[in-house]
Regions:
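Generic N-terminal amphipathic, Lys/Arg-enriched alpha-helix
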Residues: 7-11, 26, 30, 289-291
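Mg2+-dependent prenyl diphosphate-binding active-site environment of isoprenoid biosynthetic enzymes
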Residues: 22-280
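N-terminal amphipathic/basic leader segments beginning at the initiator methionine
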Residues: 1-19
């Protein structure tokens, strides 16, 4: 069974449990709407890739970890789109949750998905209680304060922004969660996988900045030009387009070098290369192809 199939099945099972009667029908519908259709499911795919590279001896726990992580990510998107933050009308090519269901239901949807993430892990804790506790700890750390995605959103309310801390929390946190949780689900030390997650997260932040500057709303499936609109710091402003692409490639080259020794090390390196290709804007792909460690 492929990663995508495993991820979708685990998320579907969790959402179905949240829709068991009696439950408020509109909120139940909004939960399903918020997680589907799934985007690239990049974070849970990275989690499963790391778990597989480490042996994946508890696949059901890996599935649960992947679904929990994606629930947190989807919750962050729902909250990020709210009028009090980005006030975005669209997400993944369709109306954002607050536009489709109302602002109060969007708040509740995001909150419910956060709770659901930890419910998923507790339901599967009997598979390996020690690993499950580790998964919950990492997910909590990378969601809340002081370094998780909540902190990342909080930085946008500060008069003076620590750019590195902002990017590390806003985007990087869930990538760190992905690599560490993948290792923990397979019985390995998650701390060794921190640098890989940090580097992938940093690269994705640069890629997001590039997309925001280069593509329109129809191409992105969400509002474009948000960094300029909200006065947010970004890599394009700092480095320019080509400089930002080179910076992203250097980050990902370091990511490959940071992969801990494991049975699937070579496969993981190929995955990072594939992500680099996907993240590079189409116009520049031929120029910046064939990434190698240290470039």
């Amino acid at each position: 069974m492929g990663f995508k199939t495993r991820i979708e099945a685990a998320i579907s099972d969790a959402i179905n449990l949240g829709q068991t009667a009696p439950s408020p029908a509109k909120l139940a519908s909004a939960l399903h709407y918020a997680v589907s259709p799934g985007g690239a499911r990049i974070r849970p795919t990275i989690l499963m890739s790391v778990a597989t590279a480490c042996g994946d001896d508890r696949p059901e726990l890996t599935n649960a970890a992947a679904a929990a992580l994606e629930c947190i990510h989807c919750a962050s998107l729902v909250h990020d789109d709210l009028p009090c933050f980005d006030n975005a009308d669209t997400r993944r090519g369709k109306p954002s949750v607050h536009r489709a269901y109302s602002e109060p239901l969007a708040v509740l949807t995001g909150d419910s998905l956060i709770v659901m993430a930890f419910q998923i892990l507790t339901r599967h804790a009997s598979i390996d209680p020690q690993r499950a506790i580790g998964l919950m700890n990492i997910l909590a750390e990378q969601t809340g304060m002081p370094n998780g995605i909540c902190a990342g959103q909080g930085w946008e309310s500060e008069q003076k922004i620590d750019l590195r801390a902002y990017h590390r929390a806003k985007t990087g946190a869930l990538f760190v969660a992905a690599t560490q949780m993948g290792a923990i689900a397979a019985g390995q030390d998650g701390a060794q996988w921190d640098e890989l997650g940090s580097r992938i997260g940093e690269a994705f932040q640069v890629a997001d900045d590039l997309s925001d500057a280069l593509y329109n709303e129809a191409e992105l499936g969400k509002p474009a030009g948000q960094d300029d609109l909200h006065g947010r710091p970004n890599a394009v402003t700092e480095y320019g387009i080509e400089g930002a692409i080179s910076h992203m490639k250097n980050i990902l080259g370091g990511a490959i070098s940071s992969i801990p020794r494991c049975p699937g090390e070579a496969i993981l390196a190929k995955m990072v290369n594939a992500q680099a290709e996907m993240l590079t804007p189409v116009k520049w792909r031929s120029k910046y192809s064939n990434l190698h460690p240290g470039e």
